[in-house]
Amino acid sequence: MSNLLAIGIAALIVALIITIVVWTIAYIEYKKLVRQRKINRLYKRISERAEDSGNESEGDAEELAALGEVGPFIPGDINNL
């Protein structure tokens, strides 16, 4: 019986680790998607303002440039998105 219990506990631990990995990957992809949507909104706003006024908005262009600077990828550092 203890052998079966050990196998059951090991299976639960493996399932927990797999769940954590999957949800972490999903969270990272979600953050990338949110970031891309923000960039697309800024790009669209800059384009609309450029059409209306004939020149680009400086503040929006600077914000878009700041979003483009990601930096080095460090696995495990979730704030590096």
Curated annotation (Swiss-Prot):
Which sequence ranges are marked TM in the entry?
A: 8-28
SUPFAM superfamilies cross-referenced by the UniProt entry: HIV-1 VPU cytoplasmic domain
Protein name as it appears in the record: Protein Vpu
The UniProt entry's sequence similarity note says: Belongs to the HIV-1 VPU protein family.
Chain positions found as Phosphoserine: S53, S57
The domain section of the record reads: The N-terminus and transmembrane domains are required for self-oligomerization and proper virion budding, whereas the cytoplasmic domain is required for CD4 degradation. The cytoplasmic domain is composed of 2 amphipathic alpha helix that form a U-shape.
Q: How does it sit in the membrane?
A: Single-pass type I membrane protein
This protein's GO CC annotations: host cell membrane; membrane
| Stated role | Enhances virion budding by targeting host CD4 and Tetherin/BST2 to proteasome degradation. Degradation of CD4 prevents any unwanted premature interactions between viral Env and its host receptor CD4 in the endoplasmic reticulum. Degradation of antiretroviral protein Tetherin/BST2 is important for virion budding, as BST2 tethers new viral particles to the host cell membrane. Mechanistically, Vpu bridges either CD4 or BST2 to BTRC, a substrate recognition subunit of the Skp1/Cullin/F-box protein E3 ubiquitin ligase, induces their ubiquitination and subsequent proteasomal degradation.
Record topological domains on the Cytoplasmic side: 29-81
Q: Which BP terms does GO give this entry?
A: receptor catabolic process; symbiont-mediated suppression of host innate immune response; symbiont-mediated suppression of host type I interferon-mediated signaling pathway; symbiont-mediated-mediated suppression of host tetherin activity; viral release from host cell
Localisation per UniProt entry: Host membrane
Query: Does this UniProt record's set of keywords contain Phosphoprotein?
Result: yes
**What phylogenetic lineage does the species belong to?**
Viruses, Riboviria, Pararnavirae, Artverviricota, Revtraviricetes
Q: Which Pfam families match?
A: Vpu (PF00558)
Q: Which organism was this protein described from? A: Human immunodeficiency virus type 1 group M subtype F1 (isolate 93BR020)
Record text on activity regulation: Ion channel activity is inhibited by hexamethylene amiloride in vitro.
Query: For this protein, what post-translational modification is recorded in UniProt?
Result: Phosphorylated by host CK2. This phosphorylation is necessary for interaction with human BTRC and degradation of CD4.
Q: Which keywords does the record carry?
A: AIDS, Apoptosis, Host membrane, Host-virus interaction, Inhibition of host innate immune response by virus, Inhibition of host tetherin by virus, Ion channel, Ion transport, Membrane, Phosphoprotein, Transmembrane, Transmembrane helix, Transport, Viral immunoevasion
Further comment found in the protein's record: HIV-1 lineages are divided in three main groups, M (for Major), O (for Outlier), and N (for New, or Non-M, Non-O). The vast majority of strains found worldwide belong to the group M. Group O seems to be endemic to and largely confined to Cameroon and neighboring countries in West Central Africa, where these viruses represent a small minority of HIV-1 strains. The group N is represented by a limited number of isolates from Cameroonian persons. The group M is further subdivided in 9 clades or subtypes (A to D, F to H, J and K).
Q: How does this chain assemble?
A: Homopentamer. Interacts with host CD4 and BRTC; these interactions induce proteasomal degradation of CD4. Interacts with host BST2; this interaction leads to the degradation of host BST2. Interacts with host FBXW11. Interacts with host AP1M1; this interaction plays a role in the mistrafficking and subsequent degradation of host BST2. Interacts with host RANBP2; this interaction allows Vpu to down-regulate host BLM sumoylation.
Where the protein is mainly located, per its record? host cell
In this entry, the parts of the chain located on the Extracellular side of the membrane are 1-7
Which InterPro entries does UniProt cross-reference here?
A: Vpu (IPR008187), Vpu_cyt_dom_sf (IPR009032)
